[in-house]
Swiss-Prot record:
Subcellular compartments: Cell membrane
Subunit and interaction comment: Homodimer and heterodimers.
Residues passing through the membrane, by range: 8-28, 50-70, 99-119, 141-161
Principal place of residence: membrane
Keywords: Cell membrane, Membrane, Transmembrane, Transmembrane helix
Protein name, as recorded: CASP-like protein XL3
GO CC, any one term: plasma membrane
Membrane topology, from the record: Multi-pass membrane protein
């Protein structure tokens, strides 16, 4: 059973890496130039700070998941002897997985909120609607946000697996005592 959980976790991590890289590529390569009143105007992800932040967050999250995938493949071939050190590593993985899930989800929500302002505009602040002028730009950002939320769901399942791997080491009868 443990080997199948490791394989499932590796497959989910690989899928997460693909979705995060796809999100970062869709955001990073997104720009559109239009001629408006004989002036060329360019819409880019750099114009929206939330998209720049999401680009950095998804890139770091993909690197973290790649590192965890390499570490789990290494630890599958090497079995440690200390149960206590394995518990510390399980706690570290659990906390880092939780932090990465929250960071990616928060980055996606911030980018979604910023994208809604770009989509609808705001007259009080004199922010214009972009999506009626830059349709491909907005469509590509929408696709990247969809990929980002799918990656968040996949990372939530990874965090659930790491929680299972952590808490199954503890005794059900004695509080915070490792099983022997």
């Amino acid at each position: 059973m443990e080997l199948s959980i490791q394989k499932i976790e590796a497959l989910i991590r690989l899928s997460t890496i693909v979705m995060l890289v796809l999100t970062a590529c869709l955001i990073g390569l997104d720009s559109q130039t239009k001629v408006i009143f004989y002036v060329q105007k360019k819409a880019s992800f750099k114009d929206l700070r939330a998209l720049v932040g999401l680009l950095y967050i998804t890139s770091l999250a993909a690197a973290y998941n790649l590192l965890q995938l390499c570490c789990s493949s290494f630890s599958a071939s090497y079995k440690g002897t200390s149960l206590q050190s394995y518990a510390y590593l399980a706690w570290l993985r659990y906390i880092l997985d939780q932090a990465v899930v929250y960071a990616v989800f928060a980055g996606n929500l911030a980018a979604l909120e910023h994208s809604f302002l770009v989509l609808t505009g705001e007259e009080n602040f004199q922010w214009l609607k972009w999506c009626n002028k830059y349709t491909r730009f907005c469509t590509q950002i929408g696709g990247s946000l969809l990929c980002g939320f799918v990656a968040s769901l996949l990372m939530f399942s990874i965090a659930s697996i790491s929680a299972f791997n952590l808490f199954r080491q503890y005794s059900p009868t004695k509080f915070m005592h490792l099983k022997l």
